[in-house]
Every structure is written in structure tokens, then in C-alpha cells.
UniProtKB/Swiss-Prot annotation:
SUPFAM superfamilies: P-loop containing nucleoside triphosphate hydrolases (SSF52540), PDZ domain-like (SSF50156), WW domain (SSF51045)
Species the sequence originates in: Mus musculus
GO cellular component assignments: bicellular tight junction; centriole; centrosome; ciliary base; cytoplasm; dendrite; late endosome; nucleus
Name recorded for this polypeptide: Membrane-associated guanylate kinase, WW and PDZ domain-containing protein 2
Function: Seems to act as a scaffold molecule at synaptic junctions by assembling neurotransmitter receptors and cell adhesion proteins. Plays a role in nerve growth factor (NGF)-induced recruitment of RAPGEF2 to late endosomes and neurite outgrowth. May play a role in regulating activin-mediated signaling in neuronal cells. Enhances the ability of PTEN to suppress AKT1 activation. Plays a role in receptor-mediated clathrin-dependent endocytosis which is required for ciliogenesis.
Keywords: Cell membrane, Cell projection, Cytoplasm, Cytoskeleton, Endocytosis, Endosome, Membrane, Neurogenesis, Phosphoprotein, Repeat, Synapse, Synaptosome
Family, as annotated: Belongs to the MAGUK family.
Effect of S1152A: Does not affect interaction with USH1G
Family annotation (SMART domains): GuKc, PDZ, WW
Modified residues (Phosphoserine): S685, S883, S884, S1013
Region described as Interaction with DDN: spans on this chain: 301-380
Residue ranges constituting the Guanylate kinase-like domain according to the UniProt record: 109-283
Transmembrane segments: none
Length: 1275
């Protein structure tokens, strides 16, 4: 990347010279504009046609910057002085000009505030501009003047308030700080003061160092000559922004010396104009100007090994780490000198922080290391916390067994009249900083939302009423007692800047724990690493596959009885006063289901300490040091809040004090791996503990009545704890650092089904380390066309990532090792098994920027002479894309299903019906798919002829080859593909058969008309939902299907015992034939972040609502999981298309939608209202994609049109949905015109409905924020 940046031409290559003379009228024929008095370069105004007397060179162009007149630099001069230089010069005039663009435009302030390497052309030009400025202006400073200095000559001495006024008014061209004082360079006046009238001294050849020109700090220089020994004096006397000293701007971390020698004197050698074509010559000329002491300048320190410093097109410095092939804005040399925030001065920022002045959001701060933003100055925040830490605590009389820093939880109530304390009301107006306070709480259903801190100078601080600990009772007459943290955040976010909100607060409740208590020490957050270290589970690093992880960890959980006696002295957690203990609460605990609720787990984690620490905080507890808060989720893989720390680097710390554990963690070297053994679950329950698992599974249709029920096999791969995120009272649902429950269920179900006692279709083992697989590493270099292969799969969580077509003559094709159908396991060492397609594409984009990629793929080998089944496909998963005429599976054969036959006869099941069959041939082009969707209903008993013809056409894509041939209809049953019977063939094999067909496929079908009888099933688009009986035991995997030689069809086989009956949707598979584009990543981007345009991931302002508390920076607060029915996640998932018919209830259809063409996204189900028709129907889920509404396709449909269609259907609505992942995609940027309304359920938990633009709104609902007019909450 750095090479490509260096090849970009510098602006100096566009500098051109024009040689002109005066015309017969004695004029030059062009107008001069700009000038330093206007904060601009001098530039050409109107160039009068025919009035310029050219002698040689290029022609003058209006708006170009004027750099030199007869080799005299004029940048930084006023227009008056530039004209004086021109007037003094004799004909011909040699003018050097350059076109505006890139880093050079007419704005002097912008150019002076950029950072350049010493000796570069830009650095020299900055010097010239500054020296020219000081001919006409005197720098200002807030420091007291020293003996011998003349006010108005050496400096203009002003107060801080006056300096801030100058800065705010735009009167300063440069500003910065040095030694706690502000320095600035004011714009020069258009007409010079008599003291500085040196027009006659600006002659060709004169330089800023020549005799007669005003020198900066002449009196200071003369005084220092006798005492230049002390480096402190030398450092102190070096000016800051006057051209001879140090400039530290908010964008600069370098101490740049501005052509001053060690003595502080201005060098006496001539100061030439920059040589624009040969910048390297200037490096020799600047040797004498470098400081004599390396520690005075970071530039003199060598970069670490294999690091490189480079410049963007705008001249900004960034650093390249060739070891990891990453880039960073942060100077690695400064990391060694980094100070903690509390030790920084108030006018400096800690290492890795940046101050942003945004015209919309105001001033905020960016932490580049932890990738977060906040409004409060980090130095002031750290000092404030330190001051509060040092204050004497008077509330230490806690209960004997209470952990230090944690207070007794107050009695919660949803009734405002039962609150004990003083009520007060206030009205706050939202500013660019938000409301100016942070909140805490709402992580559990019965927890108050309280004010955590009031941001200085924010609206709340200026109002003066709000205090830390105040309970938020009402927001605009809406009672929020019992609302979740995320819900209240959304309420505040919905308030536009400039509008006010009415708050009712209750004072008298302390915070649930003291966040400033010294016992809750913070181990600072970890610097973001490109590849987080793998979790060590039960003493082992990364497992080869998820299957291996499940199978191994399910048998290796230690029993609590193995712990030493002294570690068992633990009191029951809150809500567990009866002495019972909850089960482990983290997804990483994959203990056997029969192990009971008192199982505990020891885990070994490996965490790398970053420049800012580990990224978690610890707090004292009766049993030892516990993890109080995870500040950096990525940096602490596998760690969970409430974990008890047992060992650190093989040193037992259970009996050590809080301070001793903190010291051990501090002593761990930065960048090294630290091994932690933590204890989770069992008697060592954290202070915030969910309800017992059995309580949560009651009345939810649980597949078992007890956690230790003998009916559940011991090799059940998914313990109930894995489904924690769907529990109504869970506080950590959809936590990004934990596996997605939907994904876990899919994989677990596949394992469960594969272990049933049914003859397997093949004999390969589930452990991927067996001989039926081989893994190989493939290293590819990127060509102009990309890496030369396509990626398939990953369209739903849990689907394998597969190599699709290998492009002819591409990088992968030339390498020869990559085959279609290979399962992708690692990309540059990062595991991708079970990841989404988008995630893998992002990794490939990143690899493309580096120009190379290391892939690890897994390939099935022949098993005992028989072809292996399709590569890497988990049972029950569906290949949803045909992307290429080339085969996706190179080693597969269909011979184990049915013998190929060119004349496949109808099966026995429908011969008596005398149904007419026909062959349909579909041809497609190279760049398109066949355009039809197949529904397979192998597991659903049907009547009549369809009992033995389970596959049918479910959908035909408009304009596709299937549509153009006009011979296929929705509902047609498919007997054979290319002459091969598919009646008993699993769905995934049919998909592969069609993929291998090339550019044409022949389908033998029974037309839908032949099936239109009372005994036949309706077409897929007109079926109403059917109640089915499903369970993991009842639903057979394709692995368990009998071979076609079996006389009976799969549906005729007796089903295993069914301990559970769940209402679900059709158990069918569907696959759509369409194209997948090749991966062609863009490598033209420079570093990952752009100072001018902060990316959305972490550089956005902290939020337009109010200043978010640190917990929001680090912890992903979960949505209210009560709206996600538990049964949804236990039903067999098929990621299918399906139809939902609903009757309108008293309050509407009971669902809300997100998306639309105006938001550049598809339409999705956003919320399901409790007890509404949608949730009672049981088929619709949050995150489902809406394909059709009342028969109309939603492709390119606006949000408003979708609302209109739903309303126009009257009392009924029919939706064609595609099963989603349970999570709704976010908007790229939520438009401010979205309207919101809120409805509280009986628990007080609000449901938000994003319904579209205000033009669709109806009358406002009482009790709702009076912001944009709210839409009706009914569909």
C-alpha cells in the first residue's frame, strides 16, 4: 500500500513557470488576490485575454497559486508586499505557479497545520510562509513576558480568554501549546504598522535571515547566549509558533524545530526557495538545523524493526508495520513514552487520543487504540476520577460479607408513587454534546436507571439540578421505571438537537455500586490487535472444528467437588437465598446436559496485554478477585463479567489481596501473552445471576423437564445454557463476544442428528481430524483481476464457506491447489468456520490491500473407494446459490443416490393416477442463473400422488431463463434432473446436480394442472401455514436418509420417539439459482481511517443523544429479550421461504418493519408485539426478510409503500418471508425523518416501531415524545 501511495505524483510536479513582461501599457495583464491578511496564499485573479505579454513558459491560469516571483518566495506575504516585490523586479518576470488541489489550496491555515517530514518540500515551504508572516505580524502568547522581552515586538502578551476569542474568531493562522502556554500567529494587517514597515527591505535575493529583516525574539536570543548550557532553559526559550520553536497542534505529536540551532539563534546561511523538483537536496541543507539532542525530537529516534513512515496524498503521516501488514496513524515510538491520562497536562492528550472539532456534534475525543469516542476530555476525566478516588469515603459501613465497592441493591418498584426520596423535575435542551449526562442501570428488568455522571459544561451541568445517583422516573410524561438501558437510550436519541425534554427525577437512591471505589481498580483497555489470541478452553488452544470443540468440552468439565475446601466459602448470590445455585451463565460452558445445575467450570484464557493494559476491571469479592467489567471485548476473548480469577501465569491469586492482584497484572509486560485460569459458575456465582435454568424453561415447551432428566442423551451437543440469550430475563442477549445462539443451535442440531442410531449414508467420522479430510495451505498473490476464485456459502449463520468457481487464468487457477468445493477454514490465520459470507468477504478485502492471502482449506478424500458426500455441508443446511457453470464440488458423484437414466420412469407411487409428465429444457447464459426455486418436502406426509414426488417448483424469478422458457409453473413437481431420478434424493444433492448441469438443464415434471384435484396439495405460494410436529429427534438429517435402494420412501420410515411436540412451519428446503459475483476488492484505499472523514465503526461522535457513559463505550447492552419467544430458537431451523397469513387484531397485526428503498436496504421484521397476531401465529420471527406483501414483490419497494400495502389489505395480510438470523440489519445512517412511537407492555418494557417518514403519520399518540409526529403503532 505504501508503494502505491508513493507513486502518486506530489503537487510540486505540477508547478510550472511563466516568463512574462509588461505590456505596452506597463501592465502585467492579470489581477492578484488572496494574501496573508486574508489567511490565503497569493493567487491569480482574472487573467485578461491578450493583455499578458508572454515570453516563454506556460500560460497563466486564473485561481492558480503564486509561489515565487523571480525566485523570491511570496507565500505568506500580504498582497501589498507581493506587489512591492513585483514592482521592484525588472522584466522579464519569472512566475512560479501551481494549480490548487490536494493539500495545497488557498487556505494558509489548512496548509500550516499539516505535518511533514523535515527536509521535505512541504516542510520547507511551511518555514518560508512562517518567516514571511513574521515580517508583518507579531506572535501572541499567554505566558508572562520575560526580562528583556519587548511587548509588541517579541510577543503580544494576552490572557487565555483573549487568546480563545482570537482563536474562535478565526484571527489566528496557527495556534498551539508549549510548556502549558498558548501560542498563536495572528493574520497580518493589510497595511503594515510603522514599526514593521520593511517593504523596502523585501528585495529579490533577501531572505528571512538577511540583515535588516525582523528576527524573532532578538532580545531573547541575545540574553540566552551567555547561558545556553541548561537544556531546560534552551527548551523553554524556544518559540512555539514563531518559526523558530516547537509547534504542538491538536493534530501534531512531533516537537518540530523550526530552523533553530541549539543556541536558539537563527542560522546565518541563506534560506533559499524550495527546490520543487528535487526535495532530497534540501535534506543536506537542513543538517545544521537539527537539534543536537536526540531526545528533543521523536523523529531522531529510529522506528522499530520493519516499520516505515509514509504520507497520504494530503501529506498526513502514517506508519506501516510490515510485520503484521497493517497501518496506523499512531507513531510507535511514542508508545514507549506514553503517560497515563491522569499524568498528562490539561492541554495535552494521552497517546492514541485525538481531539475533533465537528461543526455538527461539537468537540469530542477519539481513542484510536480502543476505537471509541467520548465528549469528555480524557485527561480531565481521569483527573476527576483520581480526585474522587482520593476523597475520604464515609459510606464504608457495609455488611461484613459484602464485597468492597458494592452496595446493597435498593428495593425496586415500577410504581412511581412508591419511590422513597425527593422528586424534582427539570427541562434539558439537547445540544451538540447531547444532554450532558451519562446513565447506568437498566441491565436487568428490575433495576433503576440512574445518572452516573454529569458532564462538565453540558446542558445538565449548566442547568444545575441533576446529580449523580438520581433515578430517572419520567421522560416527557412516559414512566421509564423498568425500561431497559437500550430503550431509554433510544428515547434520548430520538430527540433532535435543539429540542427539549422534560425529566422527573427521584433523589435518594445510591448507585448499585460505587464506580469510583478504589477497590474496583481498572486494568486499562487493550490496544486493538489485528488477530486476537485464541481462547484456551480446558488447557487447549483453538479446536479444529466446532464439532471437535463440542465433543471434547462436553466431557471435560471439572466438578466442583475437586476444588480445595477453602474455595467453597461462598454466599448465595442475590435472589438465591434458599441456598440453590444457578448453572454456569456463559456460552463457553458446554457441559453435559445431565451434569446438573451445580456444575462449575475452570477455563484457561490467554490475553495479550496492550499498550493501555488488558481491557477489563476487577473488584474484590468474598471469594477473591472477580472480573467486574469487560472494557475491550475483542481484547478479552472468552472472559466474562463475574469470572473469578484463580491463577495468573501459573501463580495462584485466590488468597491474595486486591492490591496484590492488581500489581501482578501491572507487572505483566506489554505485548506478551498472559495466561489466566478463571472459575465460572457453580458455587462461585457472580453477583448478578440469572434465574435458575429450570425456571426459565418452564411453560416454554422445553425439550426436557429437568436439567438432569434421563430422557436426554448424554451426548446432547447443546446444553440449555447455550440458549441463554433468548430467556426473558437475560441481560446479555446477543452479546457480540459470545457465539450467536441461532448459529449454535444449527450446528448443535446437525451434530445431534448425525449421532442418531440410523445407518449413516457414509462412514466418515464427525471429527475433522480424521483421515477422511485433508487440510492444505494455499498462498495466493493478488493479480489485477483479484485472487481468481469465488466464495460461496455463509448466507446464514452456520453454513460452511466454500470455494466456488476458480476463474480461468486467475491467481488461484495458476496456483492449481485450490479446487471448487473446498471448505475454507482460515483466512490469514483467522478462523472462518461458521462465519457469515460478509465477514469472509471483508477478510478477503483486507488481504487484497496487502496483495496476498494465506488460505487454509479442507478437502474430503475418498472414503473406502466411495465418493464422499458434498464437501463441508452440515446436515440440514441448504446451498442457496448457484454461482458458476463450473462444478462447485469436484470430487462428488451422484452414484450413491440413483443410477443415471436417460429415461427415468415415474415411481410407483403415482402410476395409478395416470399423471402426464413432460420434459422442460432451460438454457441460461454464462452470467445468470436458471432462476427457479425448488422446495423439498421430504419429511412432510402428503396425500395422493405427491407422496412420492416431494420436490416442486416454489418460485420463478421474473425475467430469468426459467421465466423466459414459459414451460415451468409454480407448483410443478420435479421427477428427474438431466434424466436422473431425484425422488429420494436429498435437497442439497439436487442443488449440486443442477449446479453441475452447466448452461442447460432438463427437468422432468408433473405439471401443476395435473395435480389440481381434491387430493393434491396447493401450490407453494398459496399454502396456508400448517401445524407440524418437529423435534431434533424427529427430523432426519440428509446423512440419515436411506439409499434409493430402500423400497420405501423416507417419509414412510417409522419416526424415532418424540419427547417434544412443537408448532412450527413447513419443514421444507428451498434453494434459489442465482449468480454470485467474484471477489474484486478495492486496494486503492490508504490507511484504515481518515482524519477528515471518520469512518462509522468508531470515529463517530459519541452520539447525538447525550454523552454516553463508559459502559456504553465498551459493553454492548442487549435488547429486551422478552420480545423473542424462547420456542423460536428451539424449533428446527431451515432458513426457508414461507408464507404467513394473519388476521388483524384489536391493536393491529402486531409486528413492525424496518428498511425500504429509501434506506438502501431490504424490508425486515423489526419487532413482534407481545400477544399480537404475529407472535400468536408462531411463524414470523424478528429478522425475517419480507419478500412479498399481499402478492406484490418488495424488491425496490419503499418503506411507505410497504405500510400502504399492509393497510390496504384490510383485516388480512399475506406475507412471503425468508427466514432470517434473528437479528435485524442496521441502517447505514438512520434518517432523522424516521418517526417513533412507543407502547409499554405489562412489564413496562417498551416496543419501538420504526415506521417511515412523517408523511405517513397519523394523529400523535398521547404520552409519546413530542418530536417528529409519531406514526400509529398498528399495521
Amino acid at each position: 500500500m505504501s508503494k502505491s501511495l508513493k507513486k502518486k505524483s506530489h503537487w510540486t510536479s505540477k508547478v510550472h513557470e511563466s516568463v512574462i513582461g509588461r505590456n505596452p501599457e506597463g501592465q502585467l495583464g492579470f489581477e492578484l488576490k488572496g494574501g496573508a491578511e486574508n489567511g490565503q496564499f497569493p493567487y491569480l485573479g482574472e487573467v485578461k485575454p491578450g493583455k499578458v505579454a508572454y515570453e516563454s513558459g506556460s500560460k497563466l491560469v486564473s485561481e492558480e497559486l503564486l509561489l515565487e516571483v523571480n525566485e523570491t518566495p511570496v507565500a505568506g506575504l500580504t498582497i501589498r508586499d507581493v506587489l512591492a516585490v513585483i514592482k521592484h523586479c525588472k522584466d522579464p518576470l519569472r512566475l512560479k505557479c501551481v494549480k490548487q488541489g490536494g493539500i495545497v489550496d488557498k487556505d494558509l491555515r489548512h496548509y500550516l497545520n499539516l505535518r511533514f517530514q523535515k527536509g521535505s518540500v512541504d516542510h520547507e515551504l511551511q518555514q518560508i510562509i512562517r518567516d514571511n508572516l513574521y515580517l508583518r505580524t507579531v506572535p501572541c502568547t499567554t505566558r508572562p513576558h520575560k526580562e528583556g522581552e519587548v511587548p509588541g515586538v517579541d510577543y503580544i502578551f494576552i490572557t487565555v480568554e483573549e487568546f480563545m476569542e482570537l482563536e474562535k474568531s478565526g484571527a489566528l493562522l496557527e495556534s498551539g501549546t508549549y510548556e502549558d502556554n498558548y501560542y498563536g500567529t495572528p493574520k497580518p494587517p493589510a497595511e503594515p504598522a510603522p514599526l514593521l514597515n520593511v517593504t523596502d527591505q523585501i528585495l529579490p535575493g533577501a531572505t528571512p535571515s538577511a540583515e535588516g529583516k525582523r528576527k524573532r525574539n532578538k532580545s531573547v536570543t541575545n540574553m540566552e547566549k551567555a547561558s545556553i548550557e541548561p537544556p531546560e532553559e534552551e527548551e523553554e526559550e524556544r518559540p512555539v509558533v514563531n518559526g523558530n520553536g516547537v509547534v504542538i497542534t491538536p493534530e501534531s505529536s512531533e516537537h518540530e524545530d523550526k530552523s533553530a540551532g541549539a543556541s536558539g539563534e537563527t542560522p546565518s546561511q541563506p534560506y533559499p526557495a524550495p527546490v520543487y523538483s528535487q526535495p532530497e537536496e534540501l535534506k543536506d541543507q537542513m543538517d545544521d538545523t537539527k537539534p543536537t539532542k536526540p531526545e528533543e525530537n521523536e523523529d531522531s529516534d529510529p522506528l522499530p524493526d520493519n516499520w516505515e513512515m509514509a504520507y497520504t496524498e494530503k501529506g498526513e503521516v502514517y506508519f506501516i508495520d510490515h510485520n503484521t501488514k497493517t497501518t496506523s496513524w499512531l507513531d510507535p515510538r511514542l508508545a514507549k513514552k506514553a503517560k497515563p491520562p491522569e499524568e498528562c497536562k490539561e492541554n495535552e492528550l494521552p497517546y492514541g487520543w485525538e481531539k475533533i472539532d465537528d461543526p455538527i456534534y461539537g468537540t469530542y475525543y477519539v481513542d484510536h487504540i480502543n476505537r471509541r469516542t467520548q465528549f469528555e476530555n480524557p485527561v480531565l476525566e481521569a483527573k476527576r476520577k483520581l480526585q474522587q478516588h482520593n476523597m475520604p469515603h464515609t459510606e464504608l459501613g457495609a455488611k461484613p460479607l459484602q464485597a468492597p465497592g458494592f452496595r446493597e441493591k435498593p428495593l425496586f418498584t415500577r410504581d412511581a408513587s412508591q419511590l422513597k426520596g425527593t422528586f424534582l423535575s427539570t427541562t434539558l435542551k439537547k445540544s451538540n454534546m447531547g444532554f450532558g449526562f451519562t446513565i447506568i442501570g437498566g441491565d436487568e428488568p428490575d433495576e433503576f436507571l440512574q445518572v452516573k455522571s454529569v458532564i462538565p459544561d453540558g446542558p445538565a451541568a449548566q442547568d444545575g439540578k441533576m446529580e449523580t445517583g438520581d433515578v430517572i422516573v419520567y421522560i416527557n410524561e412516559v414512566c421509564v421505571l423498568g425500561h431497559t438501558h437500550a430503550d431509554v437510550v433510544k428515547l434520548f436519541q430520538s430527540v433532535p438537537i435543539g429540542q427539549s425534554v422534560n425529566l422527573v427525577l427521584c433523589r435518594g437512591y445510591p448507585l448499585p455500586f460505587d464506580p469510583e471505589d478504589p477497590a474496583n481498580s481498572m486494568v486499562p483497555p487493550l490496544a486493538i490487535m489485528e488477530r486476537p489470541p485464541p481462547v484456551m478452553v480446558n488447557g487447549r488452544h483453538n479446536y479444529e472444528t466446532y464439532l471437535e470443540y463440542i465433543s471434547r468440552t462436553s466431557q471435560s468439565v471439572p466438578d466442583i467437588t475437586d476444588r480445595p475446601p477453602h474455595s467453597l466459602h461462598s454466599m448465595p448470590a442475590d435472589g438465591q437465598l434458599d441456598g440453590t445455585y444457578p448453572p454456569p451463565v456463559h456460552d463457553d460452558n458446554v457441559s453435559m446436559a445431565s451434569s446438573g445445575a451445580t456444575q462449575a467450570e475452570l477455563m484457561t484464557l490467554t490475553i495479550v496485554k496492550g499498550a493501555q493494559g488488558f481491557g477489563f476491571t476487577i473488584a474484590d469479592s468474598p471469594t477473591g478477585q472477580r472480573v467486574k467489567q469487560i472494557l475491550d471485548i475483542q481484547g478479552c476473548p472468552g472472559l466474562c463479567e463475574g469470572d473469578l480469577i484463580v491463577e495468573i501465569n501459573q501463580q495462584n491469586v485466590q488468597n491474595l489481596s486486591h492490591t496484590e492482584v492488581v500489581d501482578i497484572l501491572k507487572d505483566c509486560p506489554v505485548g506478551s501473552e498472559t495466561s489466566l485460569i478463571i472459575h465460572r459458575g457453580g458455587f462461585f456465582s457472580p453477583w448478578k445471576t440469572p434465574k435458575p435454568m429450570m425456571d426459565r424453561w418452564e411453560n416454554q415447551g422445553s425439550p426436557q423437564t429437568s436439567l438432569s432428566a434421563p430422557a436426554v442423551p448424554q451426548n446432547l451437543p447443546f446444553p440449555p445454557a447455550l440458549h441463554r440469550s433468548s430467556f426473558p430475563d437475560s441481560t446479555e442477549a446477543f452479546d457480540p463476544r459470545k457465539p450467536d445462539p441461532y448459529e449454535l443451535y444449527e450446528k448443535s442440531r446437525a451434530i445431534y442428528e448425525s449421532r442418531q442410531q440410523v445407518p449413516p449414508r457414509t462412514s466418515f467420522r464427525m471429527d475433522s481430524s480424521g483421515p477422511d479430510y485433508k487440510e492444505l495451505d494455499v498462498h495466493l498473490r493478488r493479480m489485477e483481476s483479484g485472487f481468481g476464485f469465488r466464495i460461496l456459502g455463509g448466507d446464514e449463520p452456520g453454513q460452511p464457506i466454500l470455494i466456488g468457481a476458480v476463474i480461468a487464468m486467475g491467481s488461484a487457477d495458476r496456483d492449481g491447489r485450490l479446487h471448487p468445493g473446498d471448505e475454507l477454514v482460515y483466512v490469514d490465520g483467522i478462523p472462518v468456520a461458521g462465519k457469515t459470507h460478509r465477514y469472509v468477504i471483508d477478510l478477503m478485502h483486507h488481504a487484497a490491500r496487502n496483495g496476498q492471502v494465506n488460505l487454509t482449506v479442507r478437502r474430503k478424500v475418498l472414503c473406502g473407494g466411495e465418493p464422499c458426500p458434498e464437501n463441508g455441508r452440515s446436515p440440514g443446511s441448504v446451498s442457496t446459490h448457484h454461482s458458476s457453470p463450473r462444478s462447485d464440488y469436484a470430487t462428488y458423484s451422484n452414484s450413491n443416490h440413483a443410477a443415471p437414466s436417460s429415461n427415468a420412469s415415474p415411481p410407483e407411487g403415482f402410476a395409478s393416477h395416470s399423471l402426464q409428465t413432460s420434459d422442460v429444457v432451460i438454457h441460461r447464459k454464462e452470467n445468470e442463473g436458471f432462476g427457479f426455486v425448488i422446495i423439498s418436502s421430504l419429511n412432510r406426509p402428503e396425500s395422493g400422488a405427491t407422496i412420492t414426488v416431494p420436490h416442486k417448483i416454489g418460485r420463478i424469478i421474473d425475467g430469468s431463463p426459467a421465466d423466459r422458457c414459459a414451460k415451468l409453473k409454480v407448483g410443478d413437481r420435479i421427477l428427474a434432473v438431466n434424466g436422473q431420478s431425484i425422488i429420494n434424493m436429498p435437497h442439497a444433492d439436487i442443488v449440486k446436480l443442477i449446479k453441475d448441469a452447466g448452461l442447460s438443464v432438463t427437468l422432468r415434471i408433473i405439471p401443476q394442472e395435473e395435480l389440481n384435484s381434491p387430493t393434491s396439495a396447493p401450490s407453494s405460494e398459496k399454502q396456508s401455514p400448517m401445524a407440524q410436529q418437529h423435534s431434533p429427534l424427529a427430523q432426519q438429517s440428509p446423512l440419515a436418509q436411506p439409499s434409493p435402494a430402500t423400497p420405501n420412501s423416507p417419509v414412510a420410515q417409522p419416526a424415532p420417539p418424540q419427547p417434544l411436540q412443537l408448532q412450527g412451519h413447513e419443514n421444507s428446503y428451498r434453494s434459489e439459482v442465482k449468480a454470485r459475483q467474484d471477489v474484486k476488492p478495492d486496494i486503492r484505499q490508504p490507511p484504515f481511517t481518515d482524519y477528515r472523514q471518520p469512518p462509522l465503526d468508531y470515529r463517530q461522535p459519541p452520539g447525538g443523544d447525550y454523552s454516553q457513559p463508559p459502559p456504553l463505550d465498551y459493553r454492548q447492552h442487549s435488547p429486551d429479550t422478552r420480545q423473542y419467544p424462547l420456542s423460536d430458537y428451539r424449533q428446527p431451523q431451515d432458513f426457508d421461504y414461507f408464507t404467513v397469513d394473519m388476521e388483524k387484531g384489536a391493536k393491529g397485526f402486531g409486528f413492525s418493519i424496518r428498511g425500504g428503498r429509501e434506506y438502501k436496504m431490504d424490508l425486515y421484521v423489526l419487532r413482534l408485539a407481545e400477544d399480537g397476531p404475529a407472535i400468536r401465529n408462531g411463524r414470523m420471527r424478528v429478522g425475517d426478510q419480507i419478500i412479498e406483501i399481499n402478492g406484490e414483490s418488495t424488491r425496490d419497494m419503499t418503506h411507505a409503500r410497504a405500510i400502504e400495502l399492509i393497510k390496504s389489505g384490510g383485516r388480512r395480510v399475506r406475507l412471503l418471508l425468508k427466514r432470517g438470523t434473528g437479528q435485524v440489519p442496521e441502517y447505514g445512517m438512520v434518517p432523522s425523518s424516521l418517526s417513533m412511537c412507543m407502547k409499554s407492555d405489562k412489564h413496562g418494557s417498551p416496543y419501538f416501531y420504526l415506521l417511515g417518514h412523517p408523511k405517513d403519520t397519523t394523529n400523535p399518540t398521547p404520552g409519546v415524545l413530542p418530536l417528529p409526529p409519531p406514526q400509529a403503532c398498528r399495521k
